[in-house]
């Protein structure tokens, strides 16, 4: 039972990166302009596949036996673990040779012909913000001091979580409001919030 609870806590700490504002922004943009088209389903399917593969890997590595996040640096000796985590987070961030970049490029290309420059700049700004979070997570896996600092500053981690959850709630609101509101109004909301 204790191992299961620790595993759930670790999954919860990783959860903030999977449901990022960038991903919700991508879903909202896809729904607004493609009207539940093929790009939306491709994007959703590939993100869910990446998420499922990552959790499958975590279950098989028995990360549930860890007592805290700072002990994750013990896996630094396992090259495959570091490589897999690095590729996973870079894929979610949308770094060019990976599939996550291809999906973001499709959406960016579609936005280029459908909207104005301000909306594209907001989209790129959210992508840069999530890239910072993904790269700082990868750095904490490699750097032993930073991994131990994560346990020392739980208050700051919780503040960051609450900030991200607020934005996730806001984008879920916009995501579901699409079905009830005109898409022009949603673009107006996204430009000012």
Curated annotation (Swiss-Prot):
It catalyses: a ubiquinone + NADH + 5 H(+)(in) = a ubiquinol + NAD(+) + 4 H(+)(out). GO terms for molecular function: NADH dehydrogenase (ubiquinone) activity. One of its GO terms (cellular component) is mitochondrial inner membrane. Signal peptide: none annotated. It is an enzyme of class 7 (translocase). It is found in: Mitochondrion inner membrane. Its EC number is 7.1.1.2. The chain crosses the membrane at residues 18-38, 39-59, 83-103, 116-138, 161-181. It is a multi-pass membrane protein. It comes from the Eukaryota. Keywords: Electron transport, Membrane, Mitochondrion, Mitochondrion inner membrane, NAD, Respiratory chain, Translocase, Transmembrane, Transmembrane helix, Transport, Ubiquinone. Core subunit of the mitochondrial membrane respiratory chain NADH dehydrogenase (Complex I) that is believed to belong to the minimal assembly required for catalysis. Complex I functions in the transfer of electrons from NADH to the respiratory chain. The immediate electron acceptor for the enzyme is believed to be ubiquinone. This is NADH-ubiquinone oxidoreductase chain 2. It comes from Paramecium tetraurelia.
């Amino acid at each position: 039972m204790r191992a299961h609870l620790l595993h759930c806590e670790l999954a919860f700490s990783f959860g903030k990166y999977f449901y990022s504002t960038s991903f919700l922004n991508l879903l909202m943009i896809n729904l607004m302009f493609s009207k539940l088209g093929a790009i939306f389903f491709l994007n959703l399917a590939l993100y869910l596949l990446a998420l499922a593969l990552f959790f499958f890997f975590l279950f098989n590595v028995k990360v549930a036996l860890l007592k805290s996040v700072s002990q994750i640096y013990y896996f630094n000796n396992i090259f495959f673990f570091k490589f897999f985590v690095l590729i996973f987070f870079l894929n979610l961030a949308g770094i060019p040779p990976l599939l996550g970049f291809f999906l973001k490029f499709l959406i960016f290309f579609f936005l280029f012909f459908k909207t104005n420059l301000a909306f594209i700049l907001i989209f790129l700004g959210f992508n840069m913000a999530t890239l910072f979070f993904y790269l700082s997570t990868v750095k904490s896996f490699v750097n032993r001091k930073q991994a131990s600092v994560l346990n020392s500053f739980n208050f700051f981690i919780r503040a960051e979580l609450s900030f991200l959850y607020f934005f996730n709630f806001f984008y879920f609101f916009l995501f579901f409001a699409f079905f009830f509101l005109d898409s022009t109004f949603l673009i107006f909301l996204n430009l000012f919030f």
